[in-house]
């Protein structure tokens, strides 16, 4: 179960260890005639008592045409050192920059010869550079967490007190800026008593006007301007004396006619 029908050589019967010249000739002749093909079936078709992985490595690293074996020059060694500082232990990439050299041969030459010549600090340089780049990346990805405000405090009373305490204007000018409402806002009038003691028909007759609501056009300060003294104190026991004449009232009412 699980074994291929075309496999005629058992695992116990496979040859292990070094390749002989006869095995090299069989493998070279078969691949030259039929091509590489599928490495798992190639040993049985070529008549070799080897596994597919062993045949592949023997061909790629030793028997393939154009391969250089041994005698690595000083220029190649210098190039291997520079590429190793840049790429690290990526032997297949380093072998691609050296025509005719295999990754297995370059790795063996590095571990057996070049690594012992170089100081330890230079051989560990790629790891240190990689560690520093990781630290820089860790610093870049740090982000601040936004804080969400759920409550808002209003200090309107405190701001008004501070504004009034730090305002350079005098008290009278501040009251004038507020529209003069503070001068009349503190006074309380008994209009029923004023109407009973003073005769407003002597001043003007609002019933005879056809212009609508005239009182909406005239403020209380204008109507009672002559009744209230400048100090804001009203003496209700003082008899009323009219300052207007009949002719002045007619001229004044004529201005409000529609």
From Swiss-Prot:
One of its GO terms (cellular component) is nucleus. Residues 11-63, 64-118 form the HTH myb-type domain. This is Transcription factor TT2. GO terms for biological process: fatty acid biosynthetic process; flavonoid biosynthetic process; proanthocyanidin biosynthetic process; response to osmotic stress. Transcription activator, when associated with BHLH2/EGL3/MYC146, BHLH12/MYC1, or BHLH42/TT8. Involved in the control of flavonoid late metabolism in developing siliques. Plays a key role in determining the tissue-specific activation of leucoanthocyanidin reductase (BANYULS). It comes from the Eukaryota. Expressed at a high level in immature siliques and at a lower level in flowers. Undetected in young seedlings, roots, leaves and inflorescence stems. ATP binds at residues 47-54. GO terms for molecular function: ATP binding; DNA binding; DNA-binding transcription factor activity. Keywords: Activator, ATP-binding, DNA-binding, Flavonoid biosynthesis, Nucleotide-binding, Nucleus, Repeat, Transcription, Transcription regulation. Residues 39-63, 91-114 bind DNA. It is found in: Nucleus. The keyword Cell membrane does not apply. The keyword Lipoprotein does not apply.
């Amino acid at each position: 179960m699980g074994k291929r029908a075309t496999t005629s050589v058992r695992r116990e019967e496979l040859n292990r260890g070094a390749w002989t010249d006869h095995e090299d000739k069989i493998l070279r002749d078969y691949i030259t005639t039929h091509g590489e093909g599928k490495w798992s079936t190639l040993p049985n078709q070529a008549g070799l008592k080897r596994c597919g992985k062993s045949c592949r490595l023997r061909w790629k690293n030793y028997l393939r045409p154009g391969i250089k074996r041994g005698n690595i020059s000083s220029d190649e060694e210098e190039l291997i050192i520079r590429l190793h500082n840049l790429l690290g232990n990526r032997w297949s990439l380093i072998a691609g920059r050296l025509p005719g050299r295999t990754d297995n041969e370059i790795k063996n030459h590095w571990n057996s010869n070049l690594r012992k010549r170089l100081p330890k600090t230079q051989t560990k340089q790629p790891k240190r550079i990689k560690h520093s780049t990781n630290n820089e990346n860790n610093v870049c990805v740090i982000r601040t967490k936004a804080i969400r405000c759920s409550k808002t405090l209003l200090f309107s009373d405190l701001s008004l007190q501070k504004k009034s305490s730090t305002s350079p204007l005098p008290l009278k000018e501040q009251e004038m800026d507020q529209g003069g409402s503070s001068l009349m806002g503190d006074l309380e009038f008994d209009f029923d008593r004023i109407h009973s003691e003073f005769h407003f028909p002597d001043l003007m007759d609002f019933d005879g006007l056809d212009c609508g609501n005239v009182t909406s056009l005239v403020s209380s300060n204008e109507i009672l301007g002559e009744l209230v003294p400048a100090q804001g104190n009203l003496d209700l026991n003082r008899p009323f004396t009219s300052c207007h004449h009949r002719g002045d009232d007619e001229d004044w009412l004529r201005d409000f006619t529609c």
